Amino acid sequence: MYDNLKSLGITQPEDVDRYSLRQEANNDILKIYFRKDKGEFFAKSVKFKYPRQRKTVVADNAGHGYKEINEINPNLRYVIDELDQLCKRDQVEVDLKRKILDDLRHLESVVTNKIAEIEADLEKLTSGR
């Protein structure tokens, strides 16, 4: 699993925290950031440069003109897919934690309101005597 990342020398893909991608001239620059260890001020990162792929395509439907376009390198596309899987997994875990906390707060509110309702009913019973 994560063969493309491992081919880049990333031996522990689970340590990837996030990544950034930018275009610089005819290259795409991929920067991968790793989780910080305790006591570190800055996250470790590695940078990779991928040349953009050049293609000549038909410029119009009549087939008279051609134009040159630049596309993302296919290898980079595979690496980004793996990075998205890793980063999305972390987001899913955070979302699940947030959902559980929201459910817990809602349950707390419901129980608090129910206790107040029962206490009010008890008060009615005791004051009615």
UniProtKB/Swiss-Prot annotation:
InterPro entries registered for this protein in UniProt: UPF0325
Originating organism: Yersinia enterocolitica serotype O:8 / biotype 1B (strain NCTC 13174 / 8081)
Sequence similarity: Belongs to the UPF0325 family.
Record-linked Pfam families: DUF3461
Protein name listed in UniProt: UPF0325 protein YE3288
